[in-house]
Amino acid sequence: MLHRSFFRFAALADKKAFMELVKALRYRTEAPISDCSAALTEAAGDMDAAMQLLRKRGVARAMKKGDCVTEHGFVVSCVGSTPASGAAIITMCSETDFAARNEHFQRTCVQARDQLRKLMDATNGAVLANPEEAAKQLSDIMGEELRAAIAVLGENMRIRSIAPLVPAPHMSERLLVGSYTHGVLNVDGVGRIVGLVAVSQVRENEVISKDVLTSIGRHFVATSGAEGNYAHQNFFGSETETVGKWLKHHGLTFSSSLVQEFGKEPVVHTAAEPHQ
């Protein structure tokens, strides 16, 4: 009787220790509990070996999921560290809206933004000259992170496209970029619609607040489907001030705008070159 009690206690203790290992592995990898348990069992409780097994299985799962249709997701605002680095909108896709709302998907969007910003800064914005090639390059850089996300989400995830903000050629000096994201869940700059606006400072060295730049981005997101001359539209939130007057009041002139809603074609406005 005493022997049976001892072995039962030992079995319970071993089970508890094993579950602690499962919890630790899940915390480190974010893989499903069932996958963590199976990997630890196969690795005889060796944490490092179990992580290697999960990584290999994640790659295999990613390969299987690679051809799955991705029709849901979010758009991501990416503004370079300096105006010369440029700005762009990344479209990130998943198979379901449920997965796109997952915290791991959202964090992977942030990782993609950080990597693209590094490329933009390193090339002084030149990487955006070929958006398709930029998307491919970013996908290659993000390969391991995307495979890890696929393993956690259990469905495909990919970088669909990169849309660059292209300033008007005749208005490329003293540029500033405003950004606004609509439909954010819990990560800034990741949402359903992103608006980027390039403006030029009239007075050099004047400090333009981030709130002012965000406001102009918000206006173009709110009015992206409007027809006609943007300068004569009422500024979003104002019944008396037009966009042109609002910009003049803040010492700015419009260069270009880019609004991207997930799943739709981007809306672009570019300042016309003045007549000679």
Swiss-Prot record:
Primary location recorded for the protein, binned into one broad class: mitochondrion
CDD domains reported for this sequence: UBA_EF-Ts
Record GO cellular component, one term: mitochondrion
Record Pfam families: EF_TS
Subcellular location: Mitochondrion
InterPro entries xref list: EF-Ts_dimer_sf, Transl_elong_EFTs/EF1B, Transl_elong_EFTs/EF1B_dimer, UBA-like_sf
Keyword Metal-binding: no
A GO molecular function held by the record: translation elongation factor activity
One GO process term, biological-process aspect: mitochondrial translational elongation
Coiled coil ranges: none
Keywords (A to Z) from UniProt: Elongation factor, Mitochondrion, Protein biosynthesis
Keyword Protein biosynthesis attributed: yes
Note: This protein may be expected to contain an N-terminal transit peptide but none has been predicted.
Its biological purpose: Associates with the EF-Tu.GDP complex and induces the exchange of GDP to GTP. It remains bound to the aminoacyl-tRNA.EF-Tu.GTP complex up to the GTP hydrolysis stage on the ribosome.
PANTHER family, per database record: ELONGATION FACTOR TS, ELONGATION FACTOR TS, MITOCHONDRIAL
HAMAP family assigned to the protein according to its UniProt record, in alphabetical order: EF_Ts (MF_00050)
Family named by the database record: Belongs to the EF-Ts family.
Stated name of the protein: Elongation factor Ts, mitochondrial
Species of provenance: Leishmania braziliensis
